[in-house]
Amino acid sequence: MKESYYISNSCVIKNQKVFKNETLVFESNEADFNAFAKATYKNLQLEYPKFFKMDGLSKLAFLASEFLLSDKNEADNIALLFANKSASLDTDLKHQESIQDKDNFFPSPAIFVYTLANICIGEVSIRHRLKSESAFFCSENYQTEFMLNYANYLLQNQKADKVLCGWAEFLNDDY
């Protein structure tokens, strides 16, 4: 007999607003993403100083995950399946700027570490102590059927008890 799975929660962060299960839960007038992210972080009353060192993509994925995993049980085996269109291009461009000029060559390790899109999964995993399956995919659009099939595989084969799927797109402060 085939098991039925369902979406238990959703989170959308867009245009300085956060929606959980289609209900507006936070709004800010901060147009700049970093200022908006900081306001959202403070609203959640978190104590996780590493947040302020993250790139935009990681902050976006981290904040959405906070809204979705706030009631997580420590024993939950939650897989993470994230996707976007631009991978880590926003951070890649910042890194390129730091190494472009031979006379002013100052690559930043703090930026370089975020030049892989899957680092945002690592940030969420560390925060929530997840030692689970994870994958980050890049495609033009969210591939619903692919993600559904992947999530079903993980659940049906006891690779995970739950799966957090997400589209986390961040480029030039657009999210």
What are these regions (language model features)?
Residues M1-N149, Y153-A160, L164-Y175:
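Conserved "HGTGT" condensation-loop signature of ketosynthase/thiolase-family condensing enzymes
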